C-alpha cells in the first residue's frame, strides 16, 4: 500500500475527487493548508497582487492549497498520478506536488480488518 499526499490548487479539488471516485478509493483526508515551493509562493505576475492584499512586503508569500491524503493499493498509484497530472497541470508555477510513502499496514478500528480490506 502507498500513501499519496497531494498538494493542489483549491479549484482542482473536484477534479481530484472525481479521479479518486473512478478508482473506488475507500476514503480521503482533506486539509486546507498554506505553502510555497521554490518560487516562495509568488510568480512575477502575482507579486504585486499578493503584496497589495497583504498591505506590506513579505519575503515569503504562502499560497492556499488543499492537501489530499489517500492510501491506495500499489497498482493504483501510477494511474492516479497520471490522471492527477492530466487534470491539475496548468503549466504555471503553483500546480502542486505529489508525495508517495510506503504504508506498512492499515487497521479499521471498528472491525479490526487489516491491510487492503481496511481501506
Language-model regions: role of each:
Residues 1-119:
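Positively charged, small/polar-rich N-terminal and surface patches that mediate targeting and assembly
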